[in-house]
Amino acid sequence: MTLTATQQLQINHRSVRRFLDKPLEPGQLEVLISCGQAAATSSFIQAYSVIRVTSPQKRQAIAVAAGGQIWIEKAAEFLVFCADLRRINQACEAAGKGSLEGYSEHGLAAVIDVALMGQNVMLAAESQGLGGVFIGGIRNQPEVIVEQLDLPHRVVPLFGMCLGWPDANTEVKPRMPVESILHQDRYQEMDPLRLAEYDERMSKYYASRGSNVKLSDWSNATAQAMQGKKREHILEFLRSRGFFVC
C-alpha cells in the first residue's frame, strides 16, 4: 500500500530540540492554532486555551521548572496548552445552568480535547517544514507555570510545545510493531518474544543515534521514565484547580 503525503508526514514525526534563529512567518502561528482547533472536541466544548509565551524571563523560569530544558528559551515559539474549564463554567452560568462541580468526566474530556488539539498543531507545523517537541516537564512544578502565566481557577497547564525551524535532522524513533498495538475483539498480553525483539531494536537505536547515545532498551528506558516521573503532587494540584474533585 502506498502511503499518502499526510501518512508519510505522520510516520516521519520526530522531536526537534535544536532550532534556527529564525521566526515564524507572519500569521503562521494563527494558522497552526486554527488547525489545532479543527481537531475533534467532546460535545464541542472546546475545553482548551493556549498561552503563547514571548517573555524571555517567563521562558527562562518555565525552562528551569521543567527540568532545565533550554530549548524552551531558544525556540521561535513556545506554547503552553491548558485544559480550560473556566470558559465552560462561564458558559454554564450564562445559560442559567449553575457552576461546574469538578466532575472527573469533565476534567477527562478537557484533557483529551487538549491532547487532540496539540497533536493537530504539531502535524500542521510539520507540514510546513517546522519542527517541535512536546514539553511534559511543565508538570514538574505546575504551580510555577500558574504563577508565570497568571492562570485562573479551572485552568490547568498540561504540556508545553516548542516550535521552530529545525537546525538539524534527528532520527525517527522506531515504534512498536502494529501487531503489538492493534488487538482484535479482546485485549491480548504482549508476547514476551515480541517485546524482547523490540527491546533489541531499541537498544541498537539508542546506541547508534546521532545524539544522546545511551546503553538501554525500551523496557529499561520506560521503567526509568515511569519510576522517575511519578509527580505525586499532580492529583492534589488538579483538585486545587477544580479538576477531578468528584
Question: PLM features: residue spans?
Answer:
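Acidic, surface-exposed loops and disordered segments
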Residues: 1-246
